[in-house]
Amino acid sequence: VREMAAESWPTGDTFRPDVCVVRKSGQDAYVSAPLSSIMAGETFQTMLLDTSGVPYDSYFLSDILADEELQDYRVYIFANTRYLSEQERAAIRDTLMGADRWLVFLGDSGYITETGPSAEALSQFVGMTVTTDGSYSRAPAFVDVQHALTQDVPPFQGMSEFLVGLMTQSGQSSFTGRPQRFEIADAAATALGHYEDGAVAMATRNLGGWTSVYLGVPNSLDGAMLRNIAEEAGAYVLGAEGHETHMSGRMVSLHARKTGPVTLRLPDGTERTLDVKAQETYWIDLQGE
């Protein structure tokens, strides 16, 4: 499709983000409830990414592993990769885990193997020891650690838990089902947040050649944390944090969520400041036409 589009509508656009969201089809089959807070919460997680001020691409894992051009992003976010074959795990290790990249893993990334669920396999995949007793519980993350990755991150994280709060005013729904809890139990990892009982809910670890960020709570990658990760990884950050932004090398679209001045840091190194009004959408031409 990309090749057909390029032939029919050549743009000369050479801009590409430094961040890539990794997705895999068929992952909902491994979630017990057909309309769970994990699955529905992915919509809210996407909203957090879109308002982070960090441009990103999104590709299926199969496309990334088949195309060398998709294997040199600075940051990869594994968003819904519950089931991974041994072949896929090996390919990810060989192609993505190196070159000083940052890999971010959400919740149950890599938990399901060809022989069933495995906390050991998840631990090996994310690069730090993760445990689970298989139970389901209220599991928000409290960001209570001062760290470069937690700067400006609100103290309560977990969009699935947020969704449960919206859906539990009365009656029962599969939306009210709590997710399986994953805890980090790795002395070599640096904690970024905890569960209510003090267990580590999110952490980071430098693995010598690449850095892992693991968030045990589903859909808990806040926009501010993504922005911090991008800056630490040397990835491009547009700015306009808190507003919804999308961009190419030709234009930026910005949907304002609040009124006031907004500064965009453009790919050519210049800055552009706009006075925006809440709920209005703006298009910024980057080619000077």
Regions found by a protein language model. Give the residues of each.
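Short, Asp-centered acidic motifs that coordinate Mg2+ and/or phosphate
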Residues: 75
